[in-house]
From Swiss-Prot:
It comes from the Bacteria. PANTHER family: PROTEIN YIIM (PTHR30212:SF2). This dioxygenase system consists of two proteins: phthalate oxygenase and phthalate oxygenase reductase. Keywords: 2Fe-2S, Aromatic hydrocarbons catabolism, Electron transport, Flavoprotein, FMN, Iron, Iron-sulfur, Metal-binding, NAD, Oxidoreductase, Transport. It is an enzyme of class 1 (oxidoreductase). This is 3-chlorobenzoate-3,4-dioxygenase reductase subunit. [2Fe-2S] cluster binds at C264, C269, C272, C302. Belongs to the PDR/VanB family. It comes from Comamonas testosteroni.
């Protein structure tokens, strides 16, 4: 594999596809001309360009160290026109699409004395590579998986026999004890979560008294945008808009007819990063470094807001 260029996109072809259950699809991708794809670390995801105006992020499931290919898995929502339903239709064996280089806002901490992985449903996908890496490094770890009916467990592959993995199947009356896990974890343990919003809120409540540097999570959906209203000025067009509580800059601009590239709406992918000309941003993303935020040069308009009455953007 090759080093990452964050600005690259790659044409990939579907070389295999399998249904782990009625609603869970696993797809393997290789570069269309069979050139090496970028290497990636546990927790990484790629943007998949489902259509020209529809981009979605999917975690990379490690296939094996010997393969220069990517695996993703997703749960199909049976809503007509949903992104996952379109993915299911378009990503058939032989089909091609474009993906971004891998990005990682959910990285394992190499200094963690112990790692606790907690996931719900299809949130297992980033955890598989994490667990494989921890096994290989012989570092202490455990994984706790909540699943409605166990469909996602096939993604574990050879990890399925590991004693470090606990399964909680809700259809059998099991419930993942997030608070107990957080309370029992040593103070220097790092906790990772990926799963649905309800479980995320339970995880955040259970870990609120822990060192924030040891608490890591990925969201399935964007959190509500809260805060005082402010004005956004567009330097190039001279347009001016008010962003109210509950709205994002991205939403306001799109509703006004501006085409702004975006994808995750959670402040993790970087596609909506915009140059800031003036004003004080309220950075709420999980992508920019502390020094990048302090510089005030750019902001992610899908989630970040303003600490000043006005912002002027290079748009």
């Amino acid at each position: 594999m090759v080093a990452i260029d964050q600005h690259d996109t790659y044409s990939v072809r579907v070389i295999s596809r399998s249904h782990l259950s009625k609603d869970i699809v696993q797809v393997e991708l290789e570069e269309s001309s069979q050139r090496p794809l970028p290497d990636y670390e546990p927790g990484s995801h790629v943007d998949i360009y489902v259509q020209d105006d529809l981009v979605r992020q999917y975690s990379l499931v490690k296939a094996s160290d010997a393969q220069a290919s990517y695996q993703i898995a997703f749960k199909v929502k049976r809503d007509q026109g949903s992104a996952t339903e379109l993915m299911c239709e378009l990503l058939r064996v032989g089909a091609t699409t474009r993906i971004s280089a891998p990005r990682n806002a959910f990285a394992l901490d190499p200094q963690a004395r112990e790692t606790v992985l907690i996931c719900g449903g299809i949130g297992i996908t980033p955890m598989v590579h994490m667990a494989m890496t921890l096994v290989k490094a012989k570092r202490p770890w455990s994984m706790h998986i909540a699943s409605r009916d166990g469909d996602e467990l096939d993604l574990l592959g050879p990890l399925g026999s590991c004693s470090e993995i606990s399964r909680y199947i809700s259809s059998q009356g099991d419930r993942l004890p997030i608070r107990d896990l957080a309370e029992r974890a040593p103070a220097n343990a790092h906790l990772y979560f990926c799963g649905p919003e309800g479980m995320l809120q339970e995880f955040l409540a259970a870990t609120q008294h822990r060192d924030p540097a040891t608490v890591h999570y990925e969201q399935f959906q964007a959190a509500p945008s809260t805060g005082n209203e402010f004005t956004v000025n567009l330097a190039r067009s001279g347009a001016q808009y008010v962003v109210r509580e509950g709205e994002t800059i991205l939403d306001v601009l799109r509703n006004a007819g501006h085409h702004v590239t975006s994808s995750c709406r959670q402040g993790i992918c970087g596609m909506c990063e915009t140059t800031l000309i003036s004003g004080v941003p309220d950075h709420r993303d999980r992508l920019l470094t502390d020094s990048e935020k302090a510089s005030g040069r750019t902001m992610l308009i899908c989630c970040s807001r303003a600490l000043s009455p006005e912002l002027t953007l290079d748009l």
